[in-house]
Amino acid sequence: MSSSSSSSDDEMMKTFFIMGAAVVEEEEQGKDSTSVQHKRRIVLHRYRLEGHNRLFQDYFADTPTYPLHYFRRRFRISRSLFLRIHDAVVEHDKYFVQKRNGAGQLGLSSLQKITAAMRMLAYGASADAVDDYVRIGKSTSLESVKRFVRSIINIFGEEYLRSPTNEDVARLLEEGSQRGFPGMLGSIDCMHWVWKNCPTAWQGMYTGHFHEPTIILEAVASKDLWIWHAFFGLPGSHNDLNVLHRSPVFAQLAEGRASPCNYTVNAHEYNMGYYLADGIYPEWSTLVKTIPASRGNKHKYFAQQQESARKDVERAFGVLQARFAIVRGPGRFWQPSVLKDIMTACIIMHNMIVEDERDCQLDNNFDFNDSIPVVEPSHVQTLKGSIDED
């Protein structure tokens, strides 16, 4: 009798085990099906055609809803210059050409993609912020920005980031002579751009006196705010002097390919121009600095005039940040190469605006987002750091 009871107990245990395994399997299947449901992509009908028609009627129609000065204020550039950039970018990169998708639906127009890119550059807005008006998704906005800035560099970089030609040098020399600095070709300084999404492993290298990761821009600008030289990409642990030693600003002069620069001061002939700089820069013949703790009227007057003219590059930094708020606030992209493309493209378009509005007196004061911190030019000496190439 004991053997029969033990066998029945074994059968019962097997039954319970099979039932338990079945319950566990059903729960796992339920979890899998639930997770699949949560991962399904939500398709939004953004009514792209209506978005394009509204955008076209607002700004690009023969009789637009908003006049030209509204366009200039909101896009940071004139409509004629925008259309010039638009046509060149569409011709250069077929990504911006309107196409149909696999389902036969008409995609975004070139105006929508380029407008989204310009709004992100001009306002420093997130990719999702332009969706409700332009009717463009976040991932498409990010891709449009990356392709747009790369197209700007490839199309206009050679012309609008060129070294001064003979005609440019003659005009700069005349301009400097009128300001009391014969031989001056511009002023040089550095600016830091905060990198919000700097990888943790790199933060020590990119952190300097700002106490947060930054990337340095070295620039040379003239009185009309044209940026003649831009060197971007060194970590923020460097100072202006470290950047200068790695910069190609004097590369053409060292190779003997610089444009001729002849002028006379106190009956002495000179054939090499110079830049105005602040006190951290070295005592080179191509750099003219102020006189610290100046004594006497002559020295005080020279220091005052030098410090006044040297602010051209700081004004250029301020106008660049006003026109393109994306370089005023912290950089949110992950790759240094993308940040470099954005900075370079903004400088190119800044120079295009300077050329387009050279004879116009326009207000460059734009409404800023108070939540975006101000990026100040660098004037403090910091520790040396290693260089990280893109």
Descriptions of predicted regions:
Residues 1-100, 157, 363, 382-390:
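Charged, often Cys/His-bearing segments associated with DNA-binding zinc-finger transcription factors
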Residues 73-76, 101-108, 118, 232:
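Short basic-aromatic helix/loop recognition motifs at nucleic-acid
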Residues 86-103, 124-126, 321-331:
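Structural recognition of short helix-loop-helix hairpins that underlie histone-fold modules
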Residues 97-108, 297-302:
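Short, conserved non-catalytic motifs in the polymerase core
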Residues 110-122:
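Short, amphipathic alpha-helical "recognition" segments used to contact nucleic acids or chromatin
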Residues 127-129, 133-390:
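Short, well-ordered secondary-structure "scaffold" segments embedded in the functional core
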